[in-house]
A protein has these predicted regions:
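Transmembrane alpha-helix entry/boundary detector in multi-pass membrane proteins
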Residues: 35-58
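Individual transmembrane alpha-helices with interfacial aromatic-anchor signatures
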Residues: 7, 83, 116-138
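Interfacial non-cytosolic loop connecting adjacent transmembrane helices
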Residues: 35-41, 97-128
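Cytosolic juxtamembrane helix at the C-terminal end of the final transmembrane segment
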Residues: 2, 8, 67-73, 140-154
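Extended intrinsically disordered, low-complexity coil regions enriched in Ser, Thr, Gly, Ala
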Residues: 8-9, 26-39, 104-112, 151-154
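Loop-to-transmembrane helix junctions at the membrane interface
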Residues: 66-93
Length: 154
């Protein structure tokens, strides 16, 4: 998929964002036995954190969707490009180190990743790989969307 002027990046990023929002809505309503994992924060902080993530991601989904819809063609470039850049930067900051951590874990250099314990369970190992890959995919899709939008509108 060439990066320039291809709307498929935006549709991929939109699907990623929708899944992210839905998964965090589920986490708010069904937090499990101990969603704070014994941390110093309360259930209220956990819910507030997830509501902020849901709100920012839903706004991001609207922005991404606007990059490929006819109703948004009249919107000025400065309205859509900064949030796309900000989201891309955040996902790259989360996704790229996650993939480096995946490489460390898979090669056995550091089975627990950057800060994990050396004796993690198989479930924790695979969950870490899945989550890191998921965020890396989000970074790739949103960066592709940002580049595609930037080239389309120039």
């Amino acid at each position: 998929m060439p990066a320039c002027k291809d709307p498929r990046w935006a549709y991929g990023a939109l699907a990623w964002l929708i899944f992210f929002v839905v998964s965090h809505v589920v986490l708010v309503f069904y937090p499990g036995d101990d969603p704070t994992d014994g941390g110093p924060w309360s259930l209220r902080a956990y819910v507030i954190f997830n509501v902020v993530l849901i709100s920012v991601s839903a706004a991001g989904a609207v922005v991404v969707h606007a990059t490929v819809r006819p109703w948004a063609r009249h919107l000025p470039r400065w309205l859509l490009l900064p949030p796309l850049l900000a989201g891309s930067i955040l996902l790259v900051i989360r996704g790229v180190p996650g993939m480096v951590e995946n490489l460390l874990m898979v090669t056995g250099v550091r089975r627990g990743g950057f800060v994990g314990a050396d004796d993690i369970s198989t479930g924790e190992f695979w969950a870490g790989l899945g989550i890191n890959t998921y965020f890396f995919l989000g970074a790739v899709l949103l960066v592709g969307t940002t580049v595609s939008y930037g080239r389309r509108r120039s």
